[in-house]
Amino acid sequence: MHGLKREFRIASRNRISKEIGALMGQGKKEEAEAKKAEVAAGAKRLAELEASETELQEKITKIMMVIPNIIDESVPIGKDDSQNVEIEKFGEPIVPDFEVPYHADILDRLNGLDKESAGRTSGNGFYYLMGDAARIHSAMISYARDFMIDKGFTYCIPPFMIRSSVVNGVMSFAEMEAMMYKIEGEDLYLIGTSEHSMIGKFKGQIVEEKSLPITMTSYSPCFRKEVGSHGIEERGVYRVHQFEKQEMVVLCKPEDSMDWYNKMWSYTVEFFRSLDVPV
């Protein structure tokens, strides 16, 4: 309704402006001045309608952003993580007869982790990965990349910054505020996961059905504020502001989505089993 009123006001203003020109040409100055006052009043009302329309559109967008994705009917419903249902597990964790050191302690013994220097250069939630630890990290990323390429996925290194229109297409405002770092003075955000820029690759595009499915695997550093209940891990490297990972992204027909979900799940399980890691 606001949009219709706005269009009507614009059309009315244009019509009256033409009338003013005609009246001035006829020497009818007083009538022209009255029309000018009418235009001024209309312009004020138009500005009010435009502000109202902007406010209303923002409210509509915020409501739309919290509408969740449609989930498969087989997915169990729960209030939080405590109600997750374990469907299957593979392998048995090895329980040693000694106290298992914390991963950060192991890295310290290997001279592979320097959080103190990172605290000076970047603040809490960052670290330097050094020596063999850094080499193992890079080797694991390469292994994950090649593993997915062998599954037929196309390897991609995406942009590490994306526009707000892409962010709004992949997460809610609340998630964006809790996760994303904004580049000051630019309409750009550092990605929290390469999924965001990979999905953004198809923003505003029409993908022909014959080209589906499109399967991609992407590597990227990831940047996250980690604002919320979990916060930043003080000692370890699990919950930090910067990390790297390999992702899977599939574009397919809606009716094929669950099949592809199961395939991607099986690839994840196979990956961990190839490393003898119980899952």
Question: Where do the protein language model's features map onto the residues?
Answer:
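N-terminal alpha-helical targeting/anchoring segments
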Residues: 1-93, 108, 112
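TRNA-recognition modules of translation machinery and tRNA-sensing kinases, especially anticodon-binding
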Residues: 89-279
